[in-house]
Amino acid sequence: MIFSEDRGRYIKAQLPRGKVRRLAVDATMRASAPYQKPRRERQQANPQKKYMGRKVFIEESDVRSKRMARKAGSLIIFVVDASGSMALNRMQAAKGAALSLLTEAYQSRDQISLIPFQGDAADVLVPPTRSIALTKKRLETMACGGGSPLAHALSMAARTGMNAQKSGDVGKVVVVCIGDGRANVPLDVSLGTAEPLEPGTKPDRQALKDELIDTAKQLGSIPGFSLLMLDTENKFVSTGLAKDIADAAQGRYFKLPKTNEAAIAELTQGAVGAMKA
């Protein structure tokens, strides 16, 4: 549920905070009722022009505003690793899962967004929407290959989710990260505040990991946010990076070496259901 002073179902009256957007007439009348007789007598004894001809005397201290509530949907943000040899498989699986969730999300008011990351920066390919047509159209132009700017993707997911929450249509945000947790592009390069590394130059792995963990912690600390990490690493010996990201964000982790849309959709629905419970 989302509470506000201007949209939704009237659930109770409250003392106004600043400008009154929706006047609670019933509560205002009740608050003024005990004072009607003395106010009327005062007006008769010392007439004031602003109260002339009034039968009911309302003063500023009586005013109550409405507190409104409405059902809010969730926003599911798919953050998909579009770099490397398995990029196309991951993107196709995420695309199928997103469309599947949208088909079932009409009554729940849920929205989806998709942020692929490759090259030097992430990109909001599909902004928050409930439109299946828009999602299909946007997903027709998917770039794959190149670097892995995961920290930038998570920071963009955080920004996208917070903006959606401010709109008043979204309550909970589930970030579904599909990848192996590896990153090789520093955040300052993605943001354009530093030059890309020279060809053949390798970034500091520990610095990249620390930056990634800090970004995940920040995402996990945002009210109403939850991270679902789907680890697609298929190596015999795991690096454990995806698990570290999930732990840093206090999120959920699943090993998913064989990426498929049905598994992604099922796990995502479970995460959304857990947040709403």
Where are these regions (language model features)?
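Catalytic metal-binding/acid-base residues of hydrolase active sites
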Residues: 182
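Short small-residue beta-strand/loop micro-motif enriched in glycine and branched aliphatics
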Residues: 85-87, 137, 185
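Von Willebrand factor type A / integrin I
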Residues: 159-171, 185, 189-277
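Acidic/polar low-complexity segments with low predicted structural confidence
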Residues: 1-73
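A glycine-rich helix N-cap at a beta->alpha junction
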Residues: 138-147
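Short, basic/glycine-rich phosphate-binding loops at helix/coil junctions
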Residues: 132-136
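Well-ordered alpha-helical segments embedded in enzymatic catalytic cores
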Residues: 62-63, 97, 153-156, 211-214
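Von Willebrand factor
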Residues: 29, 68-128, 144, 151-156, ...
